[in-house]
């Protein structure tokens, strides 16, 4: 059974549609700790503002519970950011699973060039792929992003992307994984990544 964390933040429909596309139809949407602990895999989706999302996790006691899970856990977008140490968005302390901070893109642009748009929105490449999460994925594969904040490159980086500067496209530590990009919106590549996660 796949458990999707319910904390009133996240695009549940796009995630469940993506699960269905890879043949997964058994899932629950819950904030119940017992059900989360019993699940085979846990997905932490997220959209919106990091400090608000952390507050919603804390209201449910999930900010301290999620780091204790021992099965594979996948964060998506803001869900991944909440698994880092802290975020500049709302200046908030996060769960501290991944040993890095979340920063805002600085819209400086290259010297002599027009500033780049923020948020970073659209298709971009992932490189330096590590861990079985990316089994069958080619270096330089294109995935879909929508974000203004990013996890800084660190020892837990398992995929790298570049927009204005290099950043962690995905993170992994022990049984925890997180994608700054949206695998559920990344076509066949994203479907393979989700399938890989379900097979961990």
Regions found by a protein language model. Give the residues of each.
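Short acidic low-complexity segments
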Residues: 1, 27-38
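Short, flexible loop segments at the rims of nucleotide/cofactor-binding pockets, characterized by
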Residues: 19-26, 50-56, 121-127
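N-terminal beta1-alpha1 ligand-phosphate binding loop
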Residues: 2-24, 184-185
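Amide-donor transfer/coupling interface in amidating biosynthetic enzymes
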Residues: 68, 102-200
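Cysteine-nucleophile active-site neighborhood
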Residues: 48-120
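A short, N-terminal amphipathic alpha-helix
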Residues: 22, 33-38, 65-67, 200
């Amino acid at each position: 059974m796949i458990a999707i964390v319910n904390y009133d933040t996240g695009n549940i429909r796009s995630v469940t549609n993506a699960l269905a596309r890879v043949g997964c139809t058994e899932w629950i949407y819950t904030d119940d700790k017992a059900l989360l602990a019993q699940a085979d895999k846990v997905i932490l989706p997220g959209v919106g503002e990091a400090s608000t999302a952390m507050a919603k996790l804390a209201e449910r006691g999930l900010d301290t519970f999620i780091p204790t899970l021992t099965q594979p856990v996948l964060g998506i977008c803001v869900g991944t950011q909440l698994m880092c140490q802290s975020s500049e968005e709302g200046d908030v302390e996060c769960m501290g699973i991944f040993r890095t901070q979340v920063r805002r893109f600085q819209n400086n642009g290259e010297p002599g060039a027009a500033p780049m748009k923020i948020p970073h929105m659209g298709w971009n490449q992932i490189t330096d792929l590590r861990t079985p999460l990316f089994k069958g994925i080619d270096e330089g594969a294109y995935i879909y992003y929508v974000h203004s904040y990013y996890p800084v490159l660190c020892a837990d980086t398992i995929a790298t992307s570049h927009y204005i500067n290099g950043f962690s496209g995905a993170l992994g530590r022990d049984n925890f994984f997180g994608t700054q990009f949206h695998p559920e919106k990344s076509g066949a590549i994203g479907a393979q990544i989700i399938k890989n996660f379900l097979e961990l």
